[in-house]
Amino acid sequence: MRAKVRAALDALYMKRLVRELEGRPRPQHIGIMLDGNRRWAKMSGIDDPREGYRAGGAKVLDFLRWCDSAQIEHVTLFMLSDDNLARPEEQLNPLIDIIAEVVEQLAAPGNPWPVEAVGALDLLPAESASRLKTATAATQGRKGGTKVDVAVGYGGRREIVDAVRSALTEHSSQGGDIDEFIETFTMEHISKHLYSKTRSESDLIIRTSGEQRLSGFLLWQSAYAEVHFCETYWPDFREIDFLRALRSYSLRERRYGR
């Protein structure tokens, strides 16, 4: 009985949130840090942290459907940082396998999302990197769904360094010298060589689990992003929590440094 009452109240509250968002500004690019999977498992009395990651992976599909409903154009999912790659293999490899499974689910026929894996994929186990590339390649050309970047082996500082290297390599391959490169180098060169082909700046970054730091996520793209911290662990993240984040964004005055 109590569960039914709670569900009814949640449904009413969601309708209210949807009404409040009507005609309000919405982010076009959301970056979300899927944090708290291991702590969720521990809180739930589950000894195996992999079950927390699996629960978090299942939540991804729900989240993307909410983004479709809210007409969000672009989402970046922060699933594995480059710092995480230093974890022991017995912890890391199962997590990477779960991420690959999630990406393969997103790529399954019938789903609308074009998916790209962004990050230092060359640092991943070769088989896992191949699975990610194969799955994401199958989604290219899709239209109608939210564009999804899956950040795996991702670090914001590494992305900027790699972008500069890529820009320098391109310049050199065209016969340019280093002095010319230094003289003509601009911020646009970095933006052009970031991991994601979409090249859109982030409007809103959401981090679950109550942690209040960005940990290098979308370091270049988040210069003017609004940030929303949510206490809920990622596997328990609800559409209500998502709509609250959108409402928080809609009520802010974005100044873009002015």
Swiss-Prot record:
Please state what class of enzyme this protein is.
transferase
Annotated positions binding Mg(2+): D35, E226
Q: What domain of life does the UniProt record list for this protein's source?
A: Bacteria
Q: What is this enzyme's EC?
A: 2.5.1.-
Instruction: Write out the entry's keywords from A to Z.
Output: Magnesium, Metal-binding, Transferase
Cofactor binding, note field: Binds 2 magnesium ions per subunit.
Q: Which residues form the active site?
A: D35, N84
**SUPFAM superfamilies hit by this protein:** Undecaprenyl diphosphate synthase
Q: Which GO terms describe its molecular function?
A: magnesium ion binding; prenyltransferase activity; Z-farnesyl diphosphate synthase activity
GO terms under cellular component: plasma membrane
Please list the GO biological process terms of this entry: polyprenol biosynthetic process
Residues the entry annotates as binding substrate: G36, N37, R38, R39, W40, R50, S81, D82, D83, R87, R207, R213, L214, S215
Q: Which cofactor does it need?
A: Mg(2+)
Describe the family membership recorded for this protein in Swiss-Prot or TrEMBL. Belongs to the UPP synthase family.
- PANTHER family the UniProt entry points to: DEHYDRODOLICHYL DIPHOSPHATE SYNTHASE COMPLEX SUBUNIT DHDDS, DEHYDRODOLICHYL DIPHOSPHATE SYNTHASE FAMILY MEMBER
Its function, per the record, reads: Catalyzes the condensation of isopentenyl diphosphate (IPP) with allylic pyrophosphates generating different type of terpenoids.
Q: How does it assemble?
A: Homodimer.
Q: What is this protein called?
A: Isoprenyl transferase 2
The organism named in the record is Streptomyces coelicolor (strain ATCC BAA-471 / A3(2) / M145)
